[in-house]
Amino acid sequence: RRGGRVVVKQAQDLKQGDKLIKFELPIIEGTEVFNSAYTNGFYSGDGCFYKGKGFVYLYHDKQKLLDRMQNVKKVHTDENQNRQTVYFKEGTLKDKYFVPLDNYTIKSRLEWLAGICDSDGTVSRNGLNESLQISSTQLTFLQEIQLMLQTLGVTSTINEACEEGWRDMPLNDGSGETGKFFCQKAYRLLINSNSLFKLSELGFE
């Protein structure tokens, strides 16, 4: 938009001072059902794969989420670390960074999103407004999630969360101590309050 007039331009023809008109993304319904969508979403955020076995750790309050997990093979409880290790049946998990797109039903995509948000999401509050952040060292993975959100009619943004470098992190051995670990560069995907409201109208919880 320039001077009150609407002009159609290609991206490479945009100039400083041009303003983009607001638009609504369409909501696309797919037909394929993702039977273990929540579990795969959680696995994408906090899952591990070792010697042919996929599993996740549930610490503290997150152990309440065990009832939402599907295709569980066995659960190992470590009371010293207040942790459950949940192992899944072979062949029931997609690749760790798989993201369901518009060929899957809206319900399947929302359940997958709930899974990764429960494992790797952070809610930020500013007064009455809430926003949701998903962090990852895998930029392409976050871009795939951003694309999935667009198929649900929702916009989001991606920015840098932190640079790579050495940081103090928990040793994860039950001691409560920390140690120096080299961390990769991290990114975060941000979903603002308006977009969260749209997702809630679709059934996201």
Regions found by a protein language model. Give the residues of each.
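Internal intein/HINT superfamily modules and their associated LAGLIDADG
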Residues: 1-205
